[in-house]
């Protein structure tokens, strides 16, 4: 009987290091952990150059601007609100609308909608990029389209006049601000109307201890900038019309003086050569 072969000795396996065993577990934990939330600075860094959302300073600045404008518009009336109730009241008590709660409620409820009238003026810097009226860039593009020039842009022509993302966010932040600082606005309305609203609301409360540099930024305007000038052009035209009207009135009164042509003669000259000037030797 042949002897059985001796069993071969198996090589002993070395134990794995503990760090290698823990590595898959650490990777699994990293995958399960939630992503860290971005702070204000990191969130601003994520914004692209094309879309830069309004800061809290810009929001408060234009909320104060529109509040001033709304209170000025509603402060011109002499209406008195009757607060007498019941048939047995002999003397009906009344409150002036300019000092009533109704005026405050109506202004604060509609103030943020007024910000949707603003446009984004990318050619301007700082908080001045928000202003009413069409921006200089889009005004130029509209003029080119009306002249028949083909303008190719990433934004369709139908969306040129739509509310921008920045203005929509301006209105959204306004809703939050007005609700959060409702008591501050009410306190100004009742007790501190002699103080500047921008200083009282923004500098003293909303932006207390924060950056307030945008509050001092003012747009000087450029020549031909309709958004900045507003109604100044019409005023100039009306003043010129008044001056010309006064001159014609004087000419009528002095119609008998030699050298002053009659209206019929003026009309004839205008019809004969509407776009020409007299030579220098004829003057």
Curated annotation (Swiss-Prot):
Keyword Coiled coil: yes
Oligomer status and interactors: Interacts with HSP90B1; this interaction is disrupted in the presence of ATP. Interacts with TLR1, TLR2, TLR4 and TLR9.
Cellular component terms (Gene Ontology): endoplasmic reticulum
Pfam families named among the record's database cross-references: DUF3456
Glycosylated residues, chain numbering: 161
Keywords, in A-Z order: Chaperone, Coiled coil, Endoplasmic reticulum, Glycoprotein, Immunity, Innate immunity, Signal
Gene Ontology terms, MF aspect: signaling receptor binding
Disordered: annotated segments: 223-283
Record's subcellular location: Endoplasmic reticulum
Official protein name in the record: Protein canopy homolog 3
GO biological process: innate immune response
Source organism superkingdom: Eukaryota
Entry's family note: Belongs to the canopy family.
Positions in coiled-coil regions: 161-187
Function summary: Toll-like receptor (TLR)-specific co-chaperone for HSP90B1. Required for proper TLR folding, except that of TLR3, and hence controls TLR exit from the endoplasmic reticulum. Consequently, required for both innate and adaptive immune responses.
Source organism per UniProt: Sus scrofa (Pig)
Record's signal peptide: 1-35
Domain Saposin B-type: 55-276
UniProt key word Repeat: no
């Amino acid at each position: 009987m042949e002897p059985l072969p001796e069993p071969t000795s198996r090589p002993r396996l070395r134990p794995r290091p503990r760090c290698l065993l823990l590595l898959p577990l650490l990777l699994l934990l990293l995958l399960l952990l939630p992503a860290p939330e971005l702070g204000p600075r990191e969130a601003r860094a994520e914004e692209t150059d094309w879309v830069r959302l309004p800061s809290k300073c810009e929001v408060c600045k234009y909320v104060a601007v529109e509040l001033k404008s709304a209170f000025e518009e509603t402060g011109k009336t002499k209406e008195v609100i009757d607060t007498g109730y019941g048939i047995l009241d002999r003397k009906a008590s009344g409150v002036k609308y300019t000092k009533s709660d109704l005026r405050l409620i109506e202004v604060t409820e509609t103030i943020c909608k007024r910000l949707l009238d603003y446009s984004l003026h990318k050619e301007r810097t700082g908080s001045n990029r928000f202003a009413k009226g069409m921006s200089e860039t889009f005004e130029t593009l509209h003029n080119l389209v009306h002249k028949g020039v083909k303008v190719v842009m990433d934004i369709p022509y139908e969306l040129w006049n739509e509310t921008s993302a920045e203005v929509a966010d301006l209105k959204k932040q306004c809703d939050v601000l007005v609700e959060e600082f409702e008591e501050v606005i009410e306190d100004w309305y009742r007790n501190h109307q002699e103080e500047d609203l921008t200083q009282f609301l923004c500098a003293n409360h909303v932006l207390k201890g924060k950056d307030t540099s945008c509050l001092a930024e003012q747009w000087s305007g450029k020549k031909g900038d309709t958004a900045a000038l507003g109604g100044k052009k019409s005023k100039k035209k009306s003043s010129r019309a008044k001056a010309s009207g006064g001159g014609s009135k004087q000419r009528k009164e002095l119609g008998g003086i030699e050298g002053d042509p009659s209206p019929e003669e003026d009309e004839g000259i205008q019809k004969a050569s509407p776009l020409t000037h007299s030579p220098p030797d004829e003057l």
